[in-house]
Amino acid sequence: MKNILFVLYEDFHSNSALHVHHFANNLVELGLDCAVAVPRNKHTVSLVGENLTNLYQVTEYGEFYRLNECFKNQKGPDVVHVWTPREVTRNYCRKLRKAYDFQLVIHLEDNEEYVLEKYLNKPFSEIANANGSLNIPENVSHPQRYKEFLATANGVTVIIEKLKEFVPNNVPTLTLWPGVDTEHFSQRKPNPERAKQLGVPDDNIVFSYTGNVHAANTEEVKSLYLAVALLNREGQRTTLIRTGRDFENFLGDDDSWARQYAIELGYVDRSLMPEILALANVLVQPGKPDKFNDYRFPCKLPEFLAMGKPVVLPATNIGLEMENEKDALVLPAVDATHIVDSVTKLLQDKSLYKKLSDGSINFAKTHLSWQKNTKLLLSFYKEI
């Protein structure tokens, strides 16, 4: 085994691309040859950040007949690792099968059935029983074909243990956590020049949230804006610094109640993320246990934890692996009211604030190493 091809469902704008980037780079450093295939726009590899050089080759789906040129030995892939079982990646793999012989590994990072429900705004049972009468877009998983695709895999990696519920019993499975780039995401003092540049008022409580708004998380992100508005109404001047794009009108038509307290930066280069997170007093992952959150690993959480700030998160996904008031503040649900109460508590209790700051760093160092987790992945490749 020498050549590894990662297959992404989207170009490098996606959060998944960052995970693939680090796994591919670390596999190259372990002596393997890696390439990453995207549907189009391979030049977007530059979006992983100006500090992150890719050690792998990048190709587009349409170039699959000369895929061997991506590898030093001029041969095809030995392992194809698909991120994730959406129609666009499944169709690409069907074409690959006609030209190359390889071991297939599929990565799961979401409850694909719930994502499909939200995308089509219909219950999954209705979608699954539609007998082909519904048009399933390429950017989501097909209700039947994704299961058939998983059944053909030599192995499946899951980002969180609960996703194993969707994996056929006879398919080898690895729980594969992401890591965090501690060279760039690490504890530091807020940069006053950056705060001034962004227009952060002096002496305000600051939240930083780095993430897009899509159909599955509208209520969660709205709760963060609501918490900031409530804190301001109570006389605690608070600002939300937000990066990411809005794919939903989640605040309503009259959104001035929320946006007046927010500094919304849209898409920013990843090299700026550490300084943006460092401006925060507390880092909050809103949400609650449900069909969406139980099956995912929020991509921003490793970076939150590595920054050495107290982290507030719900008792689901990674929160179930953390000790409350040691690694983080783990709550049954993180909605607007709980956010207000938690932030007030942390800013008043300096001992707990310090304990959770240290705990977040320790958790990241222990569990969220790209190098360690890549070695687990390599061992899995060898076993299948």
Feature locations, PLM:
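A short, well-ordered alpha-helix in the C-terminal region of glycosyltransferases
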Residues: H338, K345, L352-H367, L376-S379
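Membrane-proximal helix-turn-helix segments that form the acceptor-binding/catalytic region
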Residues: K95-A99, L108-L116, K122-V156
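Conserved active-site histidine-acidic residue motif and adjacent donor-binding/catalytic loop
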Residues: T59-L67, R245-N249, A262-A278, V334
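N-terminal subdomain of nucleotide-sugar transferases
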Residues: M1-E50, K75, G155, V228-A229
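Donor nucleotide-sugar binding/catalytic pocket of nucleotide-sugar-dependent glycosyltransferases
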Residues: N135-K189
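Conserved catalytic-core segment of nucleotide-activated headgroup transferases in glycan assembly
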Residues: D181-D253, E264-S271
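Conserved acidic donor-binding segment of nucleotide-sugar-dependent glycosyltransferases
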Residues: E325-A336, K345-S351
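Nucleotide-sugar-dependent
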Residues: F12-L18, A216-K222, D269-I276, N281-P302, ...
